[in-house]
Amino acid sequence: MASRWAVQLLLVAAWSMGCGEALKCYTCKEPMTSASCRTITRCKPEDTACMTTLVTVEAEYPFNQSPVVTRSCSSSCVATDPDSIGAAHLIFCCFRDLCNSEL
């Protein structure tokens, strides 16, 4: 009786582990303002991170333009050091649903 209960418990545990939902990220393939990049995408199972790439920021007066970004799902997101000098584009990674909305 105990072994039958244990088998049922294992089957339920195995089933529930396989039912996890994929990560959801905001995505936009083309660079656009941060406020405009709001498409929600269910990522592939191998994607483990949401990635935001900062493409440009206005560097001249009046400094009121929104940042231009791309956002995507990523299976191997490698963030750039925000203090790095000369980086072509800053890359930010996060690891929960819809976490890449800021910037």
Swiss-Prot record:
Its primary localisation, in coarse terms, equals secreted
Q: What turns on expression?
A: Regulated by retinoic acid, EGF and IFNG/IFN-gamma. Down-regulated by IL-13 in cultured human bronchial epithelial cells (related to asthmatic condition).
Instruction: Give the result of residue 77 to R, as annotated.
Output: In MDM; decreased secretion
Q: Domain UPAR/Ly6 spans what residues?
A: 24-73
Alphabetic keyword roster: Cytokine, Disease variant, Disulfide bond, Palmoplantar keratoderma, Secreted, Signal
Gene Ontology molecular function: any one? cytokine activity
Give the signal peptide as a residue range, or say none if absent. Answer: 1-22
Please report any disulfide bonds recorded for this protein chain, giving both cysteine positions: 25-50, 28-37, 43-73, 77-93, 94-99
GO BP annotations listed:
cell activation; cell adhesion; locomotory behavior; negative regulation of cell migration; negative regulation of cell population proliferation; negative regulation of keratinocyte proliferation; neuromuscular process controlling posture; urokinase plasminogen activator signaling pathway
Q: Pfam families in the record, alphabetically?
A: UPAR_LY6 (PF00021)
Q: Which residues cross the membrane?
A: none
| One cellular component (GO) term of this entry | extracellular region
- Cross-referenced SUPFAM superfamilies, in alphabetical order? Snake toxin-like
User: Where found, per UniProt?
Assistant: Secreted
Q: Which domain of life is it from?
A: Eukaryota
Q: Identify the tissues in which this protein is expressed.
A: Granulocytes. Expressed in skin. Predominantly expressed in the granular layer of skin, notably the acrosyringium. Identified in several biological fluids such as sweat, saliva, tears, plasma and urine.
Q: What is the associated disease?
A: Mal de Meleda: A rare autosomal recessive skin disorder, characterized by diffuse transgressive palmoplantar keratoderma with keratotic lesions extending onto the dorsa of the hands and the feet (transgrediens). Patients may have hyperhidrosis. Other features include perioral erythema, lichenoid plaques on the knees and the elbows, and nail abnormalities.
- Please explain the role this protein plays, according to its UniProt record: Has an antitumor activity. Was found to be a marker of late differentiation of the skin. Implicated in maintaining the physiological and structural integrity of the keratinocyte layers of the skin. In vitro down-regulates keratinocyte proliferation; the function may involve the proposed role as modulator of nicotinic acetylcholine receptors (nAChRs) activity. In vitro inhibits alpha-7-dependent nAChR currents in an allosteric manner. In T cells may be involved in regulation of intracellular Ca(2+) signaling. Seems to have an immunomodulatory function in the cornea.
Q: Which PANTHER family match?
A: UPAR/LY6 DOMAIN-CONTAINING PROTEIN, UPAR_LY6 DOMAIN-CONTAINING PROTEIN
Q: How does it assemble?
A: Homodimer. Interacts with PLAU. Interacts with CHRNA7.
Q: What is this protein called?
A: Secreted Ly-6/uPAR-related protein 1
